[in-house]
Design a protein with these regions (language model features):
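TRNA-recognition modules of translation machinery and tRNA-sensing kinases, especially anticodon-binding
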Residues: 1-358, 384-422
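Aromatic- and charge-enriched substrate-recognition/interaction segments
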Residues: 356-381, 385-387
């Protein structure tokens, strides 16, 4: 592409997606998963678009972060996904408007009624919904929109976008596409290599008539000498007869040899087949990380009024808050600051917990500072703490407070059971 809007823009080669590297690595991934389907591979990284006028903050960028999953399946094997978890969860679905009206139904129903054309696409739509809700996206502001026939990518047989409603309206944040065998077949066609395939065993061996390439001994022997046996074995193992000569043949020992047309002949034989090689199909969920992050913040941001002043609360889900708890001594004297610092150090030394200490300003002002950066819990150390070893825990979203023993604080935070105290 050319960077810039004018004809004088510079030529650049930048990937629009991360997926293609995973397709080229299919043979290694297939071996890693012990030559069995289905399996998935995930890659995160940068993607690029030649946007003429980037706008809307993090929504439309020239360079953005993405995470893509390529899930390889056998098209002849029906996968039985369990949708029972979402039976009582109606999803907002917007099928192709040329065919159907918007509707509310569970992913299992949509799959069984062929509104979502492939059950694995429906499965990843459900898992995507779970993920978005778990990071703090409002469930009522999520919908799945099917691509119209004129909008569908050339490689896709079905595609649904997970759209999130925010300050800029409905924005596509995740795309879940059934890519069929397009990518692996395209790479095979371009490279002439046929190793981007998986093996499907037959239930019973089959006797078949087939055309094979057989090496001419009078030419193969003198041409390759010690490698002649390996060349004949590699010719016998070919899955597909090349359409053009000369072609490059890979041997088991890693060598590459060139086969000319006069070195081989085609023969019809009867063979016992125990299985067949096929090109797997792919279902791909692709996540726009920047757009999801922006909507997490957009849905979490809440501005109210307190004592006649604007009061901001960032209602982040505790599982994604950068800081788990604020440690606040009521005042920095009478030993309160030492006790608060001891608690702070104890929390910071615990894996997967983060706290910060704040001792300056009024306690109300310190609560406000914690609320506006999304800290879900605030621990206050007061004079009662010095007497009975308890502290106050304040919940960010409603300001409710309870007391807890200091000795139980770290465990309650680390196990995620703190909400049960309220």
């Amino acid at each position: 592409t050319r960077i810039g809007a004018m004809k004088g823009g510079r030529t650049a080669y930048m990937r629009p997606e991360t997926a293609q590297g995973m397709f080229m690595l299919f043979p290694a991934l297939y071996r890693h998963f012990r030559n069995r389907l289905p399996f998935g591979a995930v890659q995160t990284g940068k993607g690029y678009r030649n946007e003429i006028s980037p706008r809307q903050g993090m929504i439309r960028l020239r360079e953005f972060n993405m995470a893509e999953l390529e899930y390889f399946i056998d098209p002849d094997v029906e996968l039985n996904h369990d949708f029972s978890k979402w039976d009582s969860v109606p999803f907002s679905l917007v099928p192709d408007p040329e065919i159907r009206e918007p509707l509310e139904m569970s992913p299992g129903e949509a799959s069984s009624e062929n509104i979502i054309r492939h059950p694995t696409v429906a499965w990843f739509m459900a898992r995507t919904w779970d993920f978005l809700v778990s990071v703090g996206i409002d469930p009522s502001k999520i919908r799945f929109r099917q691509h119209e026939g004129t909008e569908m990518a050339h490689y896709a047989s079905d595609c649904w976008d997970a759209e999130i409603h925010g300050s800029y309206g409905w924005i596509e944040c995740v795309g879940i596409a059934h890519r069929g065998c397009y990518d692996l077949s395209a790479h095979e066609s371009a490279t002439g290599d046929h190793n981007l395939r998986a093996w499907r065993p037959f239930d019973e061996p089959k006797i078949v008539d087939k055309t094979v390439l057989s090496g001419k001994g009078s030419i193969i022997g003198p041409s390759f000498r010690d490698l002649a046996g390996a060349v004949n074995e590699a010719l016998d193992a070919l899955n597909q007869i090349p359409t053009e000569f000369p072609f490059e043949l890979s041997l088991d020992n890693g060598n590459q040899v060139i086969i000319e047309a006069e070195m081989v002949e085609q023969k019809r034989i009867q063979a016992t087949e125990h299985g067949e090689w096929f090109v797997p199909h792919v279902v791909e969920p692709a996540f726009g990380i920047d757009r999801i992050l922006w909507h997490v913040l957009d849905h979490a941001y809440d501005e109210t009024e307190k004592a006649g002043e604007a009061y901001t609360v960032l209602r982040l889900d505790p599982s994604i808050a950068a800081i788990d708890v604020a440690i606040l001594p009521l005042m920095e004297k009478d030993g309160l600051e030492e006790m608060a610092n001891d608690i702070h150090r104890s929390i910071c030394s615990t894996p997967n917990l983060a706290s910060y200490y704040d001792g300056s300003g009024s306690i109300g002002r310190r609560y406000a500072r914690a609320d506006e950066v999304g800290v879900p819990w605030a621990v206050t150390v007061d004079h009662e703490s010095m007497q009975d070893g308890t502290v106050t825990i304040r919940r960010r979203d409603d300001g409710v407070q309870v007391r807890i023993q200091v000795d139980d604080l770290v465990q309650t935070l680390s196990t995620g059971t703190i909400s049960s105290l309220f």
